[in-house]
Amino acid sequence: MFSSMQILPLEAPPTDGKLGPLPPSQLTDQEVEERELQAEQNNSNLAPPAAVATHTRTIGIIHPPPDIRTIVEKTAQFVSKNGLEFEKRIIVSNEKNAKFNFLKSSDPYHAFYQHKLTEYRAQNKDGAQGTDDSDGTTDPQLDTGAADESEAGDTQPDLQAQFRIPSKPLEAPEPEKYTVRLPEGITGEELDIIKLTAQFVARNGKSFLTGLSNRENNNPQFHFMKPTHSMFTFFTSLVDAYSEVLMPPKDLKEKLRKSAADLTTVLERCLHRLEWDRSQEQQKKKEEDEKELERVQMAMIDWHDFVVVESIDFADEEDEELPPPMTLDEVIRRSKASAMEEDEIVEPGKEVEMEMDEEEVKLVAEGMRAANLEENVKIENVHDEEAPMRIVKNWKRPEDRIPTERDPTKVVISPITGELIPINEMSEHMRISLIDPKFKEQKDRMFAKIRETTLAQDDEIAKNIVGLARLRPDIFGTTEEEVSNAVKAEIEKKKDEQPKQVIWDGHTGSIGRTANQALSQNANGEEQGDGVYGDPNSFPGPAALPPPRPGVPIVRPLPPPPNLALNLPRPPPSAQYPGAPRPLGVPMMQPMHQQHQLTMPGPPGHPQMMMNRPPQMQPGMHVPPPPGSQFAHHMQIPRPYGQLPPSAMGMMQPPPMPGMAPPPPPEEAPPPLPEEPEAKRQKFDESALVPEDQFLAQHPGPATIRVSKPNENDGQFMEITVQSLSENVGSLKEKIAGEIQIPANKQKLSGKAGFLKDNMSLAHYNVGAGEILTLSLRERGGRKR
C-alpha cells in the first residue's frame, strides 16, 4: 500500500527559522490594520523628526507642560493599543478642546505625541513577541520588526533563544549554619581567644557569658563581648555555629544518610548555591551599573541650556472670577472628607482604563468633585446646627461637688509639681511633666508673665465669680443660703468681740507669766462690773458654770503634778468668810494650819460648816493641767479666788447686809496647791506595761481604736480598725492620714504611756480595743515638749 503512494518532496525550512510573511488572503482585518500601522511606523522612523519654523535655531521635540504631557501619554497609550480608529474618535469628540490640539500635525507638541506613540507600540510588540516565543509560534510581522531592529543595531539575534527551556526562578538556599567568615585584620591570638570563649558560651549558656563579661569588664582582650565592638558579630556567629554542632537538629542524621547514599543531591545543592551566588553578584553589579549610568546621564545634562518657548502674562483682572480662598477649617474638613472617601471607595483599577475614553474619565471626575462639594456643604450645615438645650437637675456648685467626688485614697502628690493628681491620671501627668526637664522653670516663667499682665485669665475670672456668688447670696443663691450666711457672720462677729483666752504652754517656767496675764485680763473685766451692785456676778463666791452641751462629756480640771506650785502671792494669816466682803489687798487663801481651826457661823436654822477642808477655789478658775495633757492647749487660767485687780487697791468694800447668807461652797473642792515647782517632767514607768507577747496573747484578732481629732472640743472621735495589735504606730498614722488628710509625718499620737513612736507596735504600749489616743500636730521649729 505504501509502495503505490507517491512521495512528494518538501522544501526544508530556512536555517534562520523565518518562514516569511503570510499571504494577504490568510490575514484577518486586525492583522491588516497592524501591518498598515507597522508600515507607517517604519516610514516615520526613516523620516527625520518634524521641525517647527521658529525665529531661532532649529529645535527637535518640544516637551509639553506636565498637565498636557499626562494627557498626551495617556492618549498615545490608548491609541497604541486600540489603533488609529480610536485616535479619530478622540479628534471628533474633542474638536474644540484646546488640550487635544497635539493631535494636529501643526501643533508644536505633535512631535512629542508621535514619539510617545512609537515608544508604546514598540513596547507592545516586544511583549507580543515574548508571548509568541514561549508558545513556539512566530509572527511574520514581529519577525520583520525584529529584523529591522537587528539592522539598526548591527547585531545578530539569538536563533536558539526560542528553543531554550525557560529558567526557573532561583530560590534562596539554606543558610550556612556551620560556616563563619573571618573578619579582616584579626590576629591569630584574638581568633583563638574568641573561638575558645564561643565554645564555652555555647556549652554553658548565657549565664556563663554574663558572669565572664562582668568579671573581665576591664580586660581589653574580652572587649569583643560588648555589643559595640566590631568583633561582636563574629563572636555571636561562632557561638551559634558551635551551638548547632553541640545540639544538632533531629533530622540531621537522616539528611546525612541520604546524602551519603546519593551523591547527586549533594552536587545539586552545590550547583544551586553556585547559581544563587552568581545571581546575587549579577544583581549587585547591575544595580551598580544603573547607578553609574544615571550618574553619567545626570552629569551630561547641561542645566544652563534652555530655550524660551512661550511667555505667559497674567492680567490683574483674571483672578476676579476665582472663588475666595478657603479657611484653615475648610481645608481640614475637606481633607478629612477626602480621606474617608479614599477608605470607602475602591480605587479604580487599570482594567477600567481600558474601557473608558478620555471624555468618560472627565465626566466621572467632575461627578466625583460635585459629590464632594455636596458632602462638604452637608457637613458644614451639621456643624452650624446648635445642639439642643439640656436641662440638668440636682445641679451642685463646683465647690460643693469637690468633697463628694474627691477620694483621698485615690489621689497622690506629684513629685514634680506638688499637686494632687488622681492615680488613674498619674502616668499621663508624669509623661507630660518629663517631656521637658525644664518644665518647672518654664512654668514659673509663664506664671510670672501672667502676673505682669493686667487682664485676668479664665481661671481667675471663674474664681472671682465664685467668690462674688458666696458674698452675694441674694443674687446668686437662695433665701436659705442668705439666712445661713447672716447667721455665720453674726457668730464670727461675737467671737471677735470676746477676749482671747490665755493658754498655758505646759512649761514650768512660764507659769508665773501665764498667771499674771490671766489676772490682768480678769481685772480689766471686773472693772466694768464693779459699778453694778445688783449683778450676782459682781459678788465674790463661786460662779455658775455654763450648762454642758448635749452629748459632750464633762471635762473636769486635772490636778497639777506633785511639788508644783504656781507663782501666786501667799495669803496673810487672817480669816475671812467665803461669802463675806474682804478688805482690799487681802487675799482669801490662808495657811493650812489656821484653816483647820476656823468655823463659819451661819444664819439661824442652818448648821455650821467646818472649815477644816482645803482652801476653796471658784469653779470658774481652772488649775493648769500637767504637762503633756490633752487639755493643755484649750484651758483658761483666770486669776485665783480672792485676788483683786490692782486698780482697786486701797479701797474698802462695804460689809454685807445683815441676814444675807453666803453662797454655799462647791460640791467638789480641788486639791491643795503644791508648795514647790517641779524641775523636770516625770517619765512614765515602762515597767508597768504588760510585755508585748503577753498582751498580744490576751488581745488577739482585729481591734478598734478611738482617736480624738485635734482642735475639736465637741468630743468627736474617729474609729480606726486594725487587723492586729502587732501593727506599728506608723501604719496607724497612715490610716489616720487617709481619714483626715493629714500627712503621717505631721501627726503626733499620745496615750497613757506618753508619745507613741512610729517603729513600735501598738501592743508594746498596751493599746487595746476601745482605747482613746490623742492626736496632735507636730510643729516644726518649736520648743521640744
UniProtKB/Swiss-Prot annotation:
Pro residues composition bias: which ranges? 543-554, 653-674
Which residues does this entry mark as bearing N-acetylmethionine? Answer: M1
As one GO molecular function, the record gives: RNA binding
Q: Which residues form the Ubiquitin-like domain?
A: 707-782
Segments for region (Disordered) = 1-42, 124-175, 522-554, 639-713
Q: Name one GO cellular component term.
A: U2-type spliceosomal complex
Q: Which GO terms describe its biological process?
A: mRNA cis splicing, via spliceosome; mRNA splicing, via spliceosome
Q: Which Gene3D superfamilies match?
A: Phosphatidylinositol 3-kinase Catalytic Subunit, Chain A, domain 1 (3.10.20.90), Surp module (1.10.10.790)
Outline the subunit composition. Component of splicing factor SF3A which is composed of three subunits.
Q: What is this protein called?
A: Probable splicing factor 3A subunit 1
Q: Which organism is it from?
A: Arabidopsis thaliana (Mouse-ear cress)
Q: What is the lineage of its organism?
A: Eukaryota, Viridiplantae, Streptophyta, Embryophyta, Tracheophyta
